[in-house]
Design a protein with these regions (language model features):
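Structural motif
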Residues: 6, 50-53
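Soluble periplasmic/extracytoplasmic beta-strand elements of cell-envelope proteins
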Residues: 13-15, 60-62, 72
């Protein structure tokens, strides 16, 4: 586990899905480490978020560093997430290590 250091970049992960797609929930999202996880944004209820973050397919995970999008992981056409927890965590770790 990486230890955040005050003064370095802030990494955040946001997860977008919809209630009608709950069968494809990403159960491991809240288990991501060394980043702020903001829980699930239900784009069925939050149309502004869908437009703001340009969500075209769900589920989608977006990684932000210092408020800027640095990576996006999206579902395939069957609405199933292609990326694994390990791949998303690796991207978070890479973003944190890029400060050193």
């Amino acid at each position: 586990m990486l230890i955040p250091v005050f003064g370095f970049s802030q990494v955040e992960a946001k997860y977008f899905n919809a209630a009608w797609n709950s069968s494809n929930d990403i159960n491991w999202f809240m288990g991501l480490q060394d980043c702020n996880t903001k829980g699930i944004v239900d784009i069925g209820k939050d149309k502004e978020a869908q437009a703001k973050y340009k969500i075209a397919v769900i589920p989608t995970i977006i990684i932000f560093k210092d408020g800027e999008e640095v990576a996006r992981f999206q579902a395939d056409l069957s609405f199933k997430m292609v990326a694994t927890k390990e791949e998303v965590q690796e991207e978070i770790n890479n973003q944190l290590m890029s400060d050193f």
